[in-house]
Amino acid sequence: MNRRRRIYEGKAKILYEGPEPGTLVQFFKDDATAFNAKKHEVIDGKGVLNNRISEHIFTQLNRIGIPTHFIRRLNMREQLIKEVEIIPLEVVVRNVAAGSLAKHLGLEEGTILPRSIIEFYYKADALDDPMVTEEHITAFGWASPQEIDDIMALAIRVNDFLTGLFLGIGIQLVDFKMECGRLWEGDMMRIVVADEISPDSARLWDITTNDKLDKDRFRRDMGGLVEAYQEVARRLGIMNENDTPRPSGPTLVK
């Protein structure tokens, strides 16, 4: 039996060597973490749901011309992706005050922001991913000014698309986190959306009830995380309406 070479393991995913040069296999784990892994639990079925939801979103992004690393889903937990050079930044786009923004600026959670706000955080778990400015990014060489412009343009386009996508299924996109990477194609390089977009990396509230359908259910000990992710999958049309939560994990539409 061939054993794949493990390239990298993060808190929620594992990257393996891909079948072709320039590709990787991204495996979604069931691990739920918060506060940079200070809180950790394994929740059966979470990885399956995140794989399918992220696949659905990245497929749509590719379709409308927003470049991503996604190629195709391989199975319930894995997807084939293009190998990129990850830029060590988390890009957060906020539409509604919640989480750290509400806390740091004394805003009531749920306050609609005057306009969408883009923030950058340096990816360093040991430092709790500190917020950084464009000056920090260029001074330390994490990205060039042109790359920052490209990242911000991608963030705005992704936010516009996701806002409309979720609004159409009765969900408010409060905020989301995305990562970007450098994709080399011969001598040419372009910035693409990488990692994942799922309820793990976005705050999603039911428009009518304000019920949280995202990882805040784990962060805040609310329970019902898999059921919330299942609800997002159902509304997106990638999960059967009559499926019910089971310890062995959810059943998804193939």
Curated annotation (Swiss-Prot):
It is an enzyme of class 6 (ligase). The lineage of its organism: Bacteria, Pseudomonadati, Pseudomonadota, Alphaproteobacteria, Hyphomicrobiales. PROSITE patterns: SAICAR_SYNTHETASE_1 (PS01057). Pathway: Purine metabolism; IMP biosynthesis via de novo pathway; 5-amino-1-(5-phospho-D-ribosyl)imidazole-4-carboxamide from 5-amino-1-(5-phospho-D-ribosyl)imidazole-4-carboxylate: step 1/2. Belongs to the SAICAR synthetase family. Keywords: ATP-binding, Ligase, Nucleotide-binding, Purine biosynthesis. Coiled coil: none annotated. Signal peptide: none annotated. It comes from Brucella melitensis biotype 2 (strain ATCC 23457). HAMAP family: SAICAR_synth. It catalyses: 5-amino-1-(5-phospho-D-ribosyl)imidazole-4-carboxylate + L-aspartate + ATP = (2S)-2-[5-amino-1-(5-phospho-beta-D-ribosyl)imidazole-4-carboxamido]succinate + ADP + phosphate + 2 H(+). This is Phosphoribosylaminoimidazole-succinocarboxamide synthase. Its EC number is 6.3.2.6. It holds the Pfam family SAICAR_synt. One of its GO terms (molecular function) is ATP binding. One of its GO terms (cellular component) is cytosol. The keyword ATP-binding applies. CDD domains: SAICAR_synt_PurC. One of its GO terms (biological process) is 'de novo' IMP biosynthetic process.
